[in-house]
Design a protein with these regions (language model features):
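Basic nucleic-acid-binding interfaces
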Residues: 1-98
Length: 98
């Protein structure tokens, strides 16, 4: 059965904020493996679905980190949180962000 969904502008804003916050927490040395939950009242539950994702970091249009999963293992908001930190600090092709 095909999976169909779309992200709302509010979902995209939240996920972008989630990724930036995870990286900022890692840079500050206060990263937690427990991500902040999405705000109540978003129109769809797509952020809580178990979905795969990729987080790609670029600096000056060049690849700086990319980590992802094609299969979901946890809620999308948590996946983005963990993958953002992994792309910033654990991509074996690049030194960790500082």
């Amino acid at each position: 059965m095909p999976l169909s969904f779309s992200l709302t502008p509010a979902d995209k804003t939240f996920l972008g904020h989630q990724a930036r916050t995870a990286i900022e927490a890692g840079l500050a040395g206060v990263y937690s493996s427990t991500p902040p939950a999405p705000p109540q009242g978003l129109p769809d539950d797509v952020l809580t679905r178990s979905l795969g994702a990729f987080v790609t970091l670029t600096i000056n249009h060049g690849l700086r980190g990319c980590i992802g999963n094609i299969i979901g293992h946890e809620a999308l908001y948590a996946t983005v949180w963990h993958l953002a930190a992994a792309a910033a600090f654990q991509d074996p092709r690049f030194p960790p962000l500082t």
